[in-house]
Amino acid sequence: MSIKPLHDRVVVKPIEADEISAGGIVIPDSAKEKSTKGEVVAVGPGKPLDNGSVRAPSLKVGDKVIYGQYAGSSYKSEGVEYKVLREDDVLAVIG
């Protein structure tokens, strides 16, 4: 993948949800919810501020994150789906 996000944007590769429920039931693709967890694969240089400086991003490549279900834009490259999000759309970093 060759994508470089601008400003305070990050590229996230969604982590697929389990195909089998905790009770052992196989979940078909049509019943799966969109993933809201992912791994950061690219980070922009930071958010430009009014005074001309740039606020450095708080996320880094490799971080596992949770983001809003409808946040960002989808991007597909070589059969893999990615999400391009603003850093503000990321709700939390996982462990």
From Swiss-Prot:
SUPFAM superfamilies: GroES-like (SSF50129). Together with the chaperonin GroEL, plays an essential role in assisting protein folding. The GroEL-GroES system forms a nano-cage that allows encapsulation of the non-native substrate proteins and provides a physical environment optimized to promote and accelerate protein folding. GroES binds to the apical surface of the GroEL ring, thereby capping the opening of the GroEL channel. It is found in: Cytoplasm. The gene is groES. It holds the Pfam family Cpn10. PANTHER family: 10 KDA HEAT SHOCK PROTEIN, CO-CHAPERONIN GROES. Belongs to the GroES chaperonin family. Its main location: cytoplasm. Keywords: Chaperone, Cytoplasm. InterPro entries: Chaperonin_GroES, Chaperonin_GroES_sf, Chaprnonin_Cpn10_CS, GroES-like_sf. Transmembrane segments: none annotated. Heptamer of 7 subunits arranged in a ring. Interacts with the chaperonin GroEL. It comes from Stenotrophomonas maltophilia (strain R551-3). This is Co-chaperonin GroES. GO terms for molecular function: ATP binding; metal ion binding; protein folding chaperone; protein-folding chaperone binding; unfolded protein binding.
